[in-house]
């Protein structure tokens, strides 16, 4: 066994926001993925190992199916769980999403792994956002994200868990939309957003 494999292990588990996907732009023309887990590893240095398991487009039901092989069988000390944005994109009920998240939280706890729930970030729509229909659509989507996030925060509070509020960290405080400083497509983070995520997690 090498020295590196003896270090405490943290698994970052989720979808494209865990994979570090971002839409190509001036700062990232070649679609380079910049996972927050890499930033977390930079801060941890030799005090721990970070493994990243993010699958683009994945919904929480799919995350549940691979949780054992990807997380439980690896026996990490901690798992950071971010999921639900794709479910919301398919208009899934926040309560249904939360049931899937709780399955993963509880499976981790039963295996003596510390789960770190993460709230889902907001979204942003620029073109036509001032149109009444678009404004109502956007408000509805943000409201559903906030509903899911309240469920996540309430669960963490009841179980005495620390959770990370990615929504608040990356949202414009006035509009509650995903801030332009951290996203260039209104859905995914940019390198700046992922770096903020990793730094604040640390």
Predicted regions and their residues:
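Cell-envelope and extracellular/periplasmic
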Residues: 16-17, 53-58, 80-84, 88
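Serine-esterase "nucleophile elbow" of acetyl-processing enzymes
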Residues: 1-56, 66-75
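Alpha-helical cap/lid subdomain in secreted, periplasmic
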Residues: 3-6, 38-46, 62-202
